[in-house]
Every structure is written in structure tokens, then in C-alpha cells.
A protein has these predicted regions:
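Short beta-strand segments enriched in hydrophobic/aromatic residues
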Residues: 89-91, 122, 152-153, 302-306
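Subtilisin-like serine protease catalytic core
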Residues: 1-11, 15-65, 115, 143-145, ...
Length: 314
């Protein structure tokens, strides 16, 4: 799939040298974004193939957060034709309970300034962490406006390595979940050595990136509408699970049609706009009555991209 990937590594310090392992993670993630269903037929989503502009900002192992932040800012500023960004890296440390991390705050700043959206992996537990001990998500998965993705097993349960929210006690993170592989079945990817199987939130997020890119670039929806449709499809009509601190609003359907279309007994309205301070809008939606009553149930999914400021708490 190399013809579908445009690779850039000019922001990596050449003095750090090259290790073959540096290419493994990015190659595996790219293989899912380009054509994940070719390797995982059961996850065929109907989105087709995507071209990827891949920017290497970190090497295998530990890296400088300052250098990564500087690189990401430069990349977004100089590639403003890209709206959907996939970010599969994260801290092994827990996000602080009472403040947004510098990494998360910068993603929120870039999203507000350039009208982009980041799909961020929900970060994994390490081999040293107990599977039974809760661990909060790490930076930059505490970004308020990013679409943060956790992983599930093939049994549609939180994967053993997933971490949990919330952020600042009231922002539900992760936002959503998707299959990322676990003990009962792993994800097939293309690695530098050929086809391999793996697991992790880094391999759940690219599937959501595919769906988000389809909604934005093929269906020409705004990032707000696209994000809202994905979360709405994940939440469904069922009560929120007790695992919502790990699953977010729910598990996203596999097929893109299940995000775009509704069953014959449902009607979906998408209302979108920009509201300034003190402005109010009223929408009259004609709904038939029966015996003087409205014989239906309704739910609303509200999605917005607030301007965040770490100095103000968010």
C-alpha cells in the first residue's frame, strides 16, 4: 500500500539514528487507514481506500513531549488542506484530575484555530500495570475537542489494556470505542515484516479516522456534524453502560451506512450553525400528533467545539 502513503520524517533529529522498530507502529496504523478491511474482512466498513500523509514525530520508546508538541504544531500549520488528523501516541502517566495536559491543551488550540479535528487513541495500560486496577487516560487523550477512541475486544467489552476517564471530572473521555484487539482476537495489520496481528487503542482509532474522513471529505459534512453523527450512532437508544468511563458513549457501528442512515421507524434532523453570545434560535419541527399526543421518543446529540484556554481550566 506504499503508493497510498506520502511519508515525511524531516522533523526527526537525524542524530538520533534509525531503528527498524521506529517504522513498525506507523506502518501498522497506516495499513488500517489506507485499507484496513483488506486485512480484516469482518470489519469491512464501506468507506473504500484513503490516501495518507504520514508525519513521523516520535521514535520508538520515550520521546520529548516538547519536541513532539513543536512538531505537531508546525505540521498542522503547514498542511492546512488536511482536516482529519489521526494521532496514535500517548503518555504512560495518568492525566491530572484537575487540569488539562499541555499536550491536550495544544490540540484544542489547533482545532479551534485551524478548524481541524484530531482522532486520538485512548492510551493503553503498560505491561507493568495490573489489568484489574483502574488507570486514567494519559495525554493527549484529555483533549476536550478531540474524538478520543478506546478499544474493545471481539466480545464488545472494554479491552483488558484500556484506560478510563473522565477528564476534569465531567468531560466524558473516551468519547467512543471500537474493536482494537484483545486476548480473544487481535487486529491484522501490515508491518515492515509483512502481515502481523496486534492490539491496542492505536489500532481502534484509525477505523474511526476512516469513518470521520469519509463523512468530511466524501459526504462533505462539517467536522461538527461528522463528530455528532459518529457519537449518535455509538450511543443508540440503550441506557448508558456502567462501563461508560471506558467505552465512552458507546461502540461505533462497523458499516458507514449505519452512521449515515436510519431505520424506517426513525427520523433524524441535523441542525447546525454558529451561535454567538446571547443569541437564541427556535426551530419548528413538524411532527404528527395522535389523540392529542406525540407518540414518539426523542433524543438529542449535541456537539460543539468550544474555545479552550488552559489558564481558565480547560
Amino acid at each position: 500500500f506504499a503508493d497510498w502513503v506520502e511519508y515525511h520524517d524531516d522533523l526527526i533529529d537525524p542524530q538520533l539514528g534509525v531503528d527498524p522498530e521506529d517504522y513498525a507502529h506507523g506502518t501498522e496504523v497506516d495499513s488500517i487507514i489506507v485499507d484496513g478491511p483488506a486485512l480484516n474482512p469482518a470489519l469491512e466498513d464501506g468507506c473504500g481506500r484513503f490516501r495518507v500523509r504520514h508525519f513521523a514525530v516520535a521514535k520508538n520508546g520515550k520521546n520529548s513531549s516538547f519536541s513532539i508538541l513543536k512538531s505537531i504544531r508546525h505540521i498542522v500549520e503547514t498542511n492546512q488542506d488536511i482536516t482529519v488528523w489521526n494521532l496514535c501516541l500517548g503518555s504512560t502517566e495518568e492525566a491530572l484530575e484537575n487540569t488539562i495536559s499541555p499536550e491536550g491543551a495544544m490540540l484544542d488550540e489547533l482545532q479551534e484555530k485551524y478548524g481541524v479535528i484530531f482522532v486520538v487513541a485512548g492510551t493503553n495500560k503498560t505491561s507493568k500495570d495490573s489489568p484489574d486496577t483502574p488507570k486514567r487516560i494519559g495525554a493527549p487523550a484529555d483533549s476536550v475537542n478531540a474524538l478520543v477512541v478506546n478499544a474493545t475486544s471481539i466480545l464488545r467489552e472494554p479491552a483488558s489494556y484500556t484506560r478510563e476517564g473522565p477528564v476534569l471530572h465531567f468531560f466524558r473521555k473516551p468519547d467512543i470505542s471500537y474493536f482494537g484487539g484483545d486476548n480473544y482476537g487481535e487486529m491484522a495489520v501490515w508491518s515492515p515484516g509483512g502481515v502481523a496481528t496486534t492490539r491496542g487503542t492505536s489500532f481502534a482509532a484509525p477505523w474511526i479516522t476512516r469513518k470521520l474522513a469519509y463523512l468530511v471529505h466524501v459526504m462533505h459534512l462539517s467536522r461538527e456534524a461528522a463528530k455528532a453523527l459518529i457519537i449518535d450512532a455509538a450511543s443508540g437508544w440503550e441506557p448508558i453502560s456502567a462501563d461508560n468511563i471506558k467505552l465512552g458513549y458507546g461502540i461505533v457501528p462497523t458499516r458507514i451506512e449505519d452512521i449515515l442512515e436510519t431505520p424506517s421507524n426513525e427520523i433524524r434532523f441535523v441542525l447546525e450553525g454558529t451561535i454567538d453570545t446571547f443569541e437564541t434560535y427556535n426551530y419548528n419541527i413538524p411532527v404528527p400528533m395522535k389523540d392529542g399526543k406525540y407518540p414518539y421518543m426523542a433524543r438529542a446529540t449535541l456537539c460543539y467545539f468550544p474555545k479552550c484556554d488552559k489558564r481558565q481550566g480547560v
